């Protein structure tokens, strides 16, 4: 906002998330802003001074680094020096983000703005809980900032079961054969083969600025391994009215027994569309053996309704 009173200054991987959150907050009537550093060296004092509105009351500088023993991180030091050079006495807070490759989400950016308006804790961390020196700030509930056209999906798979490869193929099909923007992130644990994998897909009619994993408000979630239902909280990630696909060998009676009361309650209270598929049985019947990735990929295209399922199958065959 041109009359912003609280501004975050940052560079690097956090910028899209900050911009997305600032637009969301300003649409609600708040006076917040974001100053992105595109070229760090040489640091342009003239451009910095011109970009900073006179209305600003508090600044927070976010660095993705930790320099023990220093008075502050590099960008924070430069901003403080720049303010002195220009004769301004605006209060400046320092924060660290992304340590240990932690995701930075809109809720964390909102927490940074709340800190400026409230306690004004300095030299804080966000996105990681610091229970040693207690430098972290409190983070609230995660808002849904996605554009109405954006579809968020998450797939829980088993290492080497083909889930990640199928999703890479899916996002390529959507990106190549539709006008939609596409984004994909993939998580693996240390086991690789036999370990847990998580695939995070987004696509929509507008550029996607959500540079963080899908952990809440997903339109579509698929669990490709039935044992995960007893180990992980999967259905809470689905938004009301979303779709949940479970690959399992359970009969309806066994399904009722294996799903916890909490899972059933979440599905019912949020009107989640719940589907099951026995991809292993189908694979054996059609000669694919234990290879379930193509079957589950087809189920995704059928349920997600992004492109005609017949076209999707054609593109899948072409990719093999």
Stretches found by the model and what they are:
Residues 61-80, 116-133, 216, 304:
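Extended, charge-rich low-complexity interaction segments
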Residues 42-46, 58, 62-73, 149-159, ...:
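Active-site cofactor/cluster-binding pocket
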Residues 1-2, 27, 50-58, 144-150:
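Glycine-rich phosphate/diphosphate-binding loops that line cofactor/substrate pockets in enzymes
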Residues 3-30, 43-48:
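Redox- and metal-dependent alpha/beta enzyme cores, enriched for Fe-S-associated oxidoreductases
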Residues 1, 32-33, 88-93, 119-129, ...:
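Flexible, glycine/charged-enriched surface loops at secondary-structure junctions
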Residues 100-152:
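Flexible inter-domain linker/hinge segments
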Residues 26, 32-102:
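C-terminal non-catalytic interaction/assembly regions of soluble proteins
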Residues 20-34, 85, 173-179:
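Short helix-loop-beta junction
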């Amino acid at each position: 906002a041109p009359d912003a009173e609280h501004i975050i200054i940052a560079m690097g991987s956090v910028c899209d998330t900050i911009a997305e959150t600032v637009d969301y907050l300003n649409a609600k009537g708040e006076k917040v802003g974001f100053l992105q550093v595109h070229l760090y060296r040489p640091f342009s004092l003239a451009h910095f001074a011109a970009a900073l509105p006179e209305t600003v009351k508090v600044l927070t500088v976010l660095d993705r680094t930790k320099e023990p023993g220093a008075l502050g991180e590099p960008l924070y030091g430069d901003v403080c020096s720049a303010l002195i050079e220009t004769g301004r006495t605006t209060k400046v807070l320092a924060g660290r983000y992304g340590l240990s490759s932690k995701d930075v989400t809109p809720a964390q950016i909102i927490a940074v703005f709340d800190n400026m308006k409230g306690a004004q804790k300095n030299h804080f961390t966000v996105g990681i809980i610091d229970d040693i020196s207690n430098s972290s700030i409190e983070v609230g509930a995660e808002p849904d900032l996605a554009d109405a056209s954006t579809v968020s999906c998450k797939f829980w798979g088993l290492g080497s079961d083909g889930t990640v490869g199928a999703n890479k193929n899916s996002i390529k099909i959507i990106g190549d054969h539709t006008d939609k923007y596409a984004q994909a992130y993939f998580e693996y644990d240390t086991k690789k083969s036999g370990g847990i994998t998580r695939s995070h897909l987004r696509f929509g009619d507008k550029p996607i600025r959500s540079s963080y994993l899908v952990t809440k408000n997903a339109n579509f979630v698929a669990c490709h391994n039935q044992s995960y239902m007893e180990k992980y909280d999967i259905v809470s990630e689905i938004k009301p009215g979303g779709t949940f696909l479970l690959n399992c060998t359970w009969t309806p009676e066994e399904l009722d027994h294996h799903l916890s009361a909490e899972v059933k309650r979440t599905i019912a209270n949020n009107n989640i569309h719940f589907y099951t598929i026995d991809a292993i049985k189908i694979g054996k019947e059609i000669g694919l053996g234990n290879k379930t990735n193509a079957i589950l990929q087809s189920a995704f295209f059928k349920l997600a309704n992004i492109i005609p399922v017949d076209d999707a199958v054609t593109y899948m065959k072409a990719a093999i």
